[in-house]
């Protein structure tokens, strides 16, 4: 008997021995595995239970997220099980973290239904996060193969087409969230939209929890918002919009609201992350068919994305949402009130905006990845930002971003229109300084003070918020370098 035949028989006898055997012995660990271009790769941060070998824990995750159950089953012999088993092929200790390991796992592409985010995630995150062999588990990064990416639509509109529709180039887009989130009547809501747009920003926005409550039903809100948009557009000569939140209890209701938004002239609609992956993909398909921009509010993400040792890293959510087809997603500000280490946020933005990804461990990007010509998704920076931070925002986030000032517009002492004007003037001044070759990062405060001499609303805003910062240490920081989380 040849050595190859003997080895195959040995593996078969060992692997299909009745009872409970280690996952690594069942074929879910292969240190010599050669990764294929068509493999989907996942990187997990493992914290094994005391006494559990890291390799066995990695094999257990591979098994439970692909074909395994807790015991050997003879029906494996009826499948191409050696092909369909996920393979953990590498385990590395996490730098400066005791008892944590990076586990690399490869999945055959045929394990996943084409174009279905729900099916892919049912495997990758379906059962394993409650598995007893691991004390904690976090999905840090994924490489989606080119062949599988081509089965997804990608962003409904994309950054390039959105700029063409708005006829706005060479600067970040400006937005603001209507405040207070809840309680306004439709007429007052529409007035906020008008004042903000008339002051110079590009978009107003519903917040995540404004849908159709007793104090303001959705039709009323849509109509008053569109009146404000149309008046502001006519007065300014600029294309304007307001993110009309069509999130609802059922898909039928969401389609009805989205169709109505289009019928009354909106260029953009909004949904919340909490509606689920299938609903998000469905709305993205609707948006592509109807030439609408689709904004996604990441409501709920920090319940599983913020903690460093358990959950899902937000960069993975960014990849999934670009695949699903949204045009905008909130992705952090660095300088605002929400979680956001500078390197981590840069990684999120690269995932959304680049056509190809290179390995960048300080930013948490572990895999090279070609986006297969899927359109770019525009990051949105919102949460505790104001015009006095404009130099930092432009430096960290670049041009292809929506800078969304909610309280930083609505909270201006002289009114909403003055707040919007302050933000627009601050942005235009910073872009001009950058284009002139000035060191706008270090000179930013001086640039703002100089232009404020010519703009009363900006001077008032700078005086009001000059001491406001949110320099808390981020929870999610880089594993491979020391990371400064304070702002320059």
From Swiss-Prot:
The record marks 337 as: Transition state stabilizer. Keywords: Calvin cycle, Carbon dioxide fixation, Chloroplast, Lyase, Magnesium, Metal-binding, Monooxygenase, Oxidoreductase, Photorespiration, Photosynthesis, Plastid. The modification N6-carboxylysine is found at residue 205. It is found in: Plastid, Chloroplast. The keyword Isomerase does not apply. It comes from Olisthodiscus luteus. InterPro entries: RuBisCO, RuBisCo_large_chain_AS, RuBisCO_lsu_C, RuBisCO_lsu_C_sf, RuBisCO_lsu_fd_N, RuBisCO_lsu_N_sf, RuBisCO_lsuI. Belongs to the RuBisCO large chain family. Type I subfamily. Binds 1 Mg(2+) ion per subunit. Substrate binds at residues 127, 177, 181, 298, 330, 382. Its EC number is 4.1.1.39. The active site is at 179 (proton acceptor), 297 (proton acceptor). Heterohexadecamer of 8 large chains and 8 small chains. The basic functional RuBisCO is composed of a large chain homodimer in a 'head-to-tail' conformation. In form I RuBisCO this homodimer is arranged in a barrel-like tetramer with the small subunits forming a tetrameric 'cap' on each end of the 'barrel'. Its cofactor is Mg(2+). RuBisCO catalyzes two reactions: the carboxylation of D-ribulose 1,5-bisphosphate, the primary event in carbon dioxide fixation, as well as the oxidative fragmentation of the pentose substrate in the photorespiration process. Both reactions occur simultaneously and in competition at the same active site. One of its GO terms (biological process) is reductive pentose-phosphate cycle. This is Ribulose bisphosphate carboxylase large chain. The keyword Metal-binding applies. Signal peptide: none annotated.
């Amino acid at each position: 008997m040849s050595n190859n035949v003997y080895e195959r028989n040995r593996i078969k006898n060992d692997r299909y021995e009745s009872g409970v055997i280690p996952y690594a012995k069942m074929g879910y660990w292969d240190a010599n595995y050669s990764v294929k271009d068509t493999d989907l790769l996942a990187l997990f941060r493992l914290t094994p239970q005391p006494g559990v070998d890291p390799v066995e824990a990695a094999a257990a995750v591979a098994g439970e997220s692909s074909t395994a159950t807790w015991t050997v089953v003879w029906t494996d012999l009826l499948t191409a099980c050696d092909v369909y088993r996920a393979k953990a092929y590498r385990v590395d200790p996490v730098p400066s973290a005791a008892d944590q390991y990076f586990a690399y796992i490869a999945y055959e592409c045929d394990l996943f239904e084409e174009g279905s985010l729900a099916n892919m995630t049912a495997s990758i995150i379906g059962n394993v996060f409650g598995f007893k062999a691991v004390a904690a588990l976090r999905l840090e990064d994924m490489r989606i193969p080119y062949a599988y990416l081509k089965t997804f639509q990608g962003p409904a509109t994309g950054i390039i087409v959105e700029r063409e529709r708005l006829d706005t180039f060479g600067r970040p887009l400006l937005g603001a969230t209507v405040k207070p989130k809840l309680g306004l009547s439709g007429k007052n809501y529409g007035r906020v939209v008008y004042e903000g747009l008339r002051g110079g920003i590009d978009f107003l926005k519903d917040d995540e929890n404004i849908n159709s409550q007793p104090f303001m039903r959705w039709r009323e809100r849509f109509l008053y918002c569109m009146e404000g948009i149309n008046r502001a557009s006519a007065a300014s000569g600029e294309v304007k919009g307001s993110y009309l939140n069509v999130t609802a209890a059922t898909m039928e209701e969401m389609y009805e609201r989205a169709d109505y938004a289009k019928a009354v002239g909106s260029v953009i609609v909004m949904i919340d992350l909490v509606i689920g992956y299938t609903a998000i993909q469905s709305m993205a398909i609707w948006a592509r068919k109807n030439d609408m921009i689709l904004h996604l509010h990441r409501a709920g993400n920090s319940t599983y994305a913020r903690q460093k040792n358990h959950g899902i890293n937000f960069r993975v959510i960014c990849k999934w949402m670009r695949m699903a087809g949204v045009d905008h997603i909130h992705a952090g500000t660095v300088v605002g009130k929400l979680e956001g280490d500078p390197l981590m946020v840069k990684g999120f933005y690269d995932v959304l905006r680049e056509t190809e990804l290179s390995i960048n461990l300080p930013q948490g990007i572990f895999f090279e990845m070609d986006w297969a010509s899927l359109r770019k998704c525009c990051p949105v920076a919102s949460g505790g930002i104001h015009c006095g931070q404009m130099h930092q925002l432009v430096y960290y986030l670049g041009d292809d971003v929506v800078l969304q000032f909610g309280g930083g517009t609505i909270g201006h002492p002289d009114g909403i229109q003055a707040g919007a004007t302050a933000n627009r003037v601050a942005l235009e001044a910073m872009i001009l300084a950058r284009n002139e070759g000035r060191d706008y990062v270090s000179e930013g405060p001086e640039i703002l003070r100089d232009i404020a001499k010519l703009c009363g609303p900006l001077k008032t805003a700078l005086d009001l918020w000059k001491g406001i910062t949110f320099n808390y240490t981020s929870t999610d920081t880089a594993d491979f370098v020391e990371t400064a989380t304070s702002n320059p």
